[in-house]
Amino acid sequence: MRVPGIPDEEFIREEKIPMTKEEIRVLALSKARLFYGAKFLDVGSGTGSVSVEAGLIVGEKGKVYAVERDPQAVELTRKNVEKFSLRNVEIIEGEAPEVLNKINDELDSAFIGGTERLEEIIPVVSEKIRRGGMIVLDAILIESAVKALHTLSELGYKAEVIEVIVAKGMKTSKGYAMISRNPIFIIYGEKK
């Protein structure tokens, strides 16, 4: 079984396309409760880092749908999917929630990485999630976290939130200094 935690440096990157960092991916995917054979949706795939990690976890019997509206990010997701030799990731170019109608599978879990239009995207994603499935989101802004919590709660999810502050060690001439990254909210809930 594959566990998440691919080092960030292993992904092909482009300066203006955001990437969910390694430690946040690990926590978010654990909250998604992925398993071999699962069907998973990544809304706002960016670099494709979450889609790649998920694709490795769900394996050849599983399926990952990577949704992205930015053509450059779509291409970057494609490059990373190819780099990791994944055949179980389907990339869907377009705006969520509109393009989500292209997904006919019942999903086990979903990750929403973009924070625009949450009140529109979350209900459409929820319709595709099986009972007992998970929706996970990450957000930098408190307002986005509150919108996500409120929307999940309105849909009957037991919504929860954690704030994650990661500091990575950087070697200096005298030892290691801890360099802090941006705090991130991870919001998640199980469909009842």
Swiss-Prot record:
Disulfide bridge positions per record: none
Reaction catalysed by this enzyme: Co-precorrin-6B + S-adenosyl-L-methionine = Co-precorrin-7 + S-adenosyl-L-homocysteine + CO2
Coiled-coil regions, chain positions: none
Keyword Transferase appears in the UniProt entry: yes
Root EC class: transferase
Keyword Repeat: no
HAMAP family, per the entry: CbiT
Similarity comment text for this entry: Belongs to the methyltransferase superfamily. Archaeal-type CbiT family.
Name listed for the protein in its UniProt record: Probable cobalt-precorrin-6B C(15)-methyltransferase (decarboxylating)
Organism: Sulfolobus acidocaldarius (strain ATCC 33909 / DSM 639 / JCM 8929 / NBRC 15157 / NCIMB 11770)
Higher taxonomy: Archaea, Thermoproteota, Thermoprotei, Sulfolobales, Sulfolobaceae
Gene name of this polypeptide: cbiT
